[in-house]
């Protein structure tokens, strides 16, 4: 086992706080409409320019192990907020720094860390309850566009594109963000269900110029296993031809004689047909095949379910008015599934989403839900250079996450105003002892930090701005950093998703509470080579 270094008390917290400040000071300059960019050096290719808080935080790794502990803990705030809310990472970082800074000062002054944390937790619960009471639902696409524009640093076009995409595919629909090769940012909406598997052979192509397969009035065979021979389903193929239908075969794989038979039938003109692999892997593949069966009205052919190819009849196939296959994807349009069965399947998946604790499983379930419930929209982000495209893509993804959060829990006045006004509910709140009172005061001060930072980044004294907002009795009064004016945030269209504000405060207080109650840090002792490297970085002063 390698040697370890141990730091106690004030020494440990001081080193940790230095790391916290290094990371937070780097991230918080990106906050607000006049926040600055950060350039990230990359190991290959051009440098990356971003205003995304969690992207900046992930790049920071400090050479001092004890300082790095503090930095990594605050990085965890940004990561957790990003995972839970999808936005608000910079706000969470600013809050965590403010709470940790004030809390460590209080501990150094001799206050009990555990009582401080109890006071902090009590105050946070009150503020969160007040934020929930201030929240109001998102009204329409225009309001969704406002949320999007704000998250995209005032770029209204991005907000409108996301609002339009949501209007078409539904708030539960899949919206993908990709990079475009052109200058423009475009939105393409796919009506129907799409999965990421394309045609198995280019011989199935029906439109050589577009390199796609298009099947109309299409029967769909869903098979859970591999198909290596079609001898047992010749009667079915004949029935499809007699019914003047076209055919899509979806299976774990179609290979050998089975694939050859389908290709020959297509080339001879006897049957317009295509084959694709089933989407997903393992248990996920079986679940997605069942989704496809419900959506298209098909019977899933599976040994486990007791169905065999030789017993399949025409009425066991699914149907869609149109199927489009590229080399990478398959789209089913206007499928013939029973609406009640589809609604029941959607309900099952929603229940599974609520029950699962795995972030990965939740993401996959949400993708399945979206495919069944809404459809698919693709936003292709354009730009003049690769660097610009990547920076814009970051902003579009943040905007998309913010709008989804707004739809889920509603919106509150933006620009840090909601936290300021919710904090007024702490007036007169008392803890069980003076140390808990100090914890409550820490939150009263810390929740001003995002507004102060937004103002500072706009070149205006944050203390003055915070004071004016606190003095006003209106719960919607705030500061518009873009125009450098005061007014009603809701009327100005400056709104934040309630979920983003709530989770940013919860996660910041949670991690900061752990930092405040830390008394000892144990870190790996640097090896000789590392110590020499650190001496070189300090100019060799020893």
UniProtKB/Swiss-Prot annotation:
PROSITE patterns named among the record's database cross-references: CHAPERONINS_CPN60 (PS00296)
Name of the protein in question: Chaperonin GroEL 2
Catalytic activity: ATP + H2O + a folded polypeptide = ADP + phosphate + an unfolded polypeptide
Stored Pfam families: Cpn60_TCP1 (PF00118)
This protein's GO CC annotations: cytoplasm
HAMAP family tied to this protein: CH60
Recorded family membership: Belongs to the chaperonin (HSP60) family.
